[in-house]
Amino acid sequence: MNDNQNNNNQTAENVVETKDLTLSFGEDVAVQSLNMYVPRGKIFGFIGPSGCGKTTTVRLLTGFYKPTSGTLSVLGKNPADFTKADREKLGYLIQQFVLYPDLTVWENLNFAASFYGVSPFRGKRLNKLLEFVELSEHRNKLARDLSGGMKRRLSLAATMVHNPELLFLDEPTAGIDPILRRKFWDYFKELQEQGHTLFVTTQYVGEAAYCDLVGVMYEGRLLMVASPEGLRRRAFGGDIVGIKTTEGMSYDQRHQLEAQPFVHGKVKVIDEQENDVIVDEASAAIPALIEWCQTQKLNVETIEEKTPPYDDVFVKIIEMEAANG
C-alpha cells in the first residue's frame, strides 16, 4: 500500500512536511519512513489504535524527539533549530492534565499566559478563552475539583493562550463522553475558521469525518492519507450503491452486472432482493444502473449510495495492509 502523499503537492503553504521520517529506540522501530505534509489552515486527523505511533510522531514534529533518519520541516524549519520565537508559534495539548490542581481555573490560565509572555493587559483575552471553552462560570473553581471534561477544556484554553499558529492536539477527546467530544470538534472548527492549522491525533475512527485530511497510522507506519471521502473510496475501491429489486436478481444477472463497465469487482449479495455494487461515482452510475435493471426487467424498489461508517473503513484499510504483507 502506498503510504506517501504526493510530493508534487509540497509547497510553502505546508506547515508540516516529512520525508522518510524514522525513529527507532534500539532495535524497536517506533515510526517508519513517514512521508506526509499538512497544508496551512487545514485540520489534519492522525488516526490509529493506541500504541501505533501517533504520540511519538507528534513528539518528533514538536522537537521532543530527534529522528533516527529522514527529514522534517515544521513552519519552514527543522524543530531542532527552533528559537523561542519559533516555539511560541506552536500549541501542544498533551494527553495528561499538567496544570496546577491547587490553582483556580483563572489562575492556571493566567499562569500559562505569563509563561508565554502574553501582555500584562491580557484579561480580555483570558475571558474570551474561558468563554470559548465554556468555563467562565467556573473561573474560581480549583483545578482539582473540575470534571475530566472540564480539565480537558481548561487544557485547551491554556494551549491557545498565546494564539499559536499551529496546534498539535494529542488525543484531545480521549476519555470524554460523545456529546463533549462533538463539542470539542465544534471548538476545533472555530479555531480553523480563525486561521489556525490543527494536527489532531485520535483513536476514535469516526472523528475522521470532522477533518480535511486523514492519515491512517498502524504499527508505526502511515498506511494512507486522504480526505474523509477519499479514505472511504480508497478502502472500498469506489462508491457503494445498494440496489433493492422486487423480483430479486438471479446468479446470471449478477454475473452480467459485474461485466458492466461502470461496476468494479463482485456484486455483494445482501439478501434475496438486495445487492451492493462498487462504482466510480454513485451519482453518475445510479442512472446507468436503473437503465440496466430495466433491460433485465427488474423492478427497482430502492437504489441509493451507501456510506459505510469509518470504523468499517479503518478495518478495511488494515485488511488491505495485511493482504499486501
What are these regions (language model features)?
Residues 110, 114-138:
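Conserved ABC ATPase "signature" region
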Residues 187-200, 205-276:
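ABC transporter nucleotide-binding domain
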Residues 167-170:
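Catalytic Walker B motif of ABC-type/P-loop ATPase nucleotide-binding domains
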Residues 102, 142-146:
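Conserved ABC ATPase signature
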Residues 62:
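Helix-to-loop junction immediately C-terminal to a conserved catalytic motif
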